[in-house]
């Protein structure tokens, strides 16, 4: 098979960037991944992988079995778990089960995955090691498709055939080649906390409520408080919680969308006061309270979405840039599908590149980019809208949740 004349340059070692790199590498197409952070960076929280996302990845990797993915990424993999979630919604002020999906089917369709473990698993799914270069923060790109150069803040310069923008919601590449495409800040409050428990404490305090589910979703009167397993061993459990709600008005003390990174790690007094007034049920009240917060790592997350028109994507392609992941379809984390579409982006882009490189003729990469966007643009942009709508629906008033629960009971 003929190879492209120059290397594909992938900016960002997240899910979409590593998926693209792994599949190109497995097909013999040279590529380099550049990552601004250090190798020890951590994003150890868990995400939900849906069948449409992981099945495409497993197929592209040579029809690997689902069990291989589960053994590598499930938060409870070290104790023989499968990353299973019950997909139930509970009233976080009473503990009452509001929405309970039919669990009579034996097939598991959603898999919780630890993000760190997922990145490692993707990177390891091949005989040849990926070329990932850390400490490379992008400064600019220059050139056109087939001949483009990436310039980094450490003065390094790399020439390639195509730049894959896998650099996230605040994409440096997007801000340069498409300065008019800016992330849209969603009027939502979202705080994320991380903490640890011994297995004994977990089995005593959380397991009676969650069963074997890797996430315990609590919904309240316009706010949510999910508890999620990030990683579990025989002796220790790493967990996180989220507190999210819509903005109440212009004077909302917790709506701070443009916080500096250091301030985003501080616990504001308004959050402590608000959590104390929620009157939560067990197990949520044990962890989302002023005293417990003192021992948790707490982060303020700003929810941003990115929309991109087909014309925008095409113009970037003419400059040698193609987008994957959050750089062009960022969506809410809770209730979102971002990780799944990041996987699909990597699968579909790599497939498009492999097909055109193997075919005769010129303008290989221009054709690959056009082919990729022909399917990926509509899929991903619809997902952004769908996920944003779902986020607001998941933060509905308590009266609506109770109405839904009553209708479910009558339908049985």
Curated annotation (Swiss-Prot):
Role noted for this protein: FAD-dependent monooxygenase; part of the gene cluster that mediates the biosynthesis of neosartoricin B, a prenylated anthracenone that probably exhibits T-cell antiproliferative activity, suggestive of a physiological role as an immunosuppressive agent. The non-reducing polyketide synthase nscA probably synthesizes and cyclizes the decaketide backbone. The hydrolase nscB then mediates the product release through hydrolysis followed by spontaneous decarboxylation. The prenyltransferase nscD catalyzes the addition of the dimethylallyl group to the aromatic C5.
Binding-site list for FAD: 35, 46, 119, 326, 339
UniProt-recorded name of the protein: FAD-dependent monooxygenase nscC
Class of this enzyme: oxidoreductase
SUPFAM superfamilies on file: FAD/NAD(P)-binding domain (SSF51905)
A matching Pfam family: FAD_binding_3
Keyword field contains Signal: yes
InterPro entries cross-referenced by the UniProt entry: FAD-bd (IPR002938), FAD/NAD-bd_sf (IPR036188)
Keywords: FAD, Flavoprotein, Glycoprotein, Monooxygenase, Oxidoreductase, Signal
Necessary cofactors: FAD
Pathway per the UniProt entry: Secondary metabolite biosynthesis
Glycosylation sites: 92, 170, 231
Similarity remark: Belongs to the paxM FAD-dependent monooxygenase family.
Segment forming the signal sequence: 1-21
Entry EC no(s): 1.-.-.-
MF terms (GO), sorted A to Z: FAD binding; monooxygenase activity
KW Acetylation (keyword) present: no
Domain of life: Eukaryota
């Amino acid at each position: 098979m003929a190879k492209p004349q120059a290397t594909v340059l992938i900016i960002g070692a997240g899910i979409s960037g590593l998926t693209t790199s792994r599949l190109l590498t497995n097909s013999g197409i040279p590529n380099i991944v550049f990552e601004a952070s250090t190798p020890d960076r951590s994003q150890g929280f868990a995400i939900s992988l849906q069948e449409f996302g992981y099945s495409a990845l497993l197929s592209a990797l040579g029809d690997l079995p689902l069990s291989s993915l589960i053994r590598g990424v499930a938060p409870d993999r070290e104790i023989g778990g499968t990353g299973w979630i019950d997909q139930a919604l509970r009233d976080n002020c009473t503990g009452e089960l509001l929405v309970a999906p039919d669990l009579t089917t034996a097939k598991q369709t959603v898999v919780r995955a630890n993000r760190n473990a997922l990145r490692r698993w993707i990177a390891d799914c091949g005989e040849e090691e990926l070329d990932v270069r850390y400490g490379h923060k992008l400064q600019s790109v220059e050139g056109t498709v087939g001949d483009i150069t990436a310039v980094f803040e450490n003065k390094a310069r790399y020439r390639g055939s195509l730049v894959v923008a896998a650099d996230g919601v605040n994409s440096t590449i997007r801000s340069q080649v498409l300065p008019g495409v800016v992330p849209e800040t969603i009027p939502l409050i979202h705080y994320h906390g991380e903490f640890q428990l011994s297995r004994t404490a977990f089995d005593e305090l959380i397991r009676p409520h969650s069963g074997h589910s890797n996430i315990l979703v609590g919904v309240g009167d316009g706010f949510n408080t999910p508890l999620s397993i990030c990683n579990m061993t025989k002796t220790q459990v790493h967990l996180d919680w989220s507190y999210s709600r819509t903005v109440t008005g212009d004077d909302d003390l917790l709506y701070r969308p443009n916080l500096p990174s250091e301030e985003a790690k501080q616990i504001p007094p308004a959050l402590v006061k608000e959590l104390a007034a929620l009157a939560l049920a067990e197990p949520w009240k044990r962890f989302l309270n002023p005293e417990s917060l003192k021992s948790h790592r707490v982060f303020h997350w700003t929810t941003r979405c990115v929309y991109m028109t087909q014309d925008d994507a095409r113009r970037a392609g003419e400059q040698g840039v193609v987008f994957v992941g959050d750089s062009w379809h960022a969506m809410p984390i809770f209730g979102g599908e971002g990780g799944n579409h990041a996987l699909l982006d990597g699968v579909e882009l790599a497939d498009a590149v492999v097909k055109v490189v193997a075919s005769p003729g010129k303008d290989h990469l221009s054709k690959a980019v056009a082919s990729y966007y022909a399917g990926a643009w509509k899929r991903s942009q619809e997902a952004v809208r769908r996920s944003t709508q779902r986020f607001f629906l998941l933060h509905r008033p308590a009266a609506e949740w109770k109405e839904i629960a009553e209708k479910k009971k009558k339908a049985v």
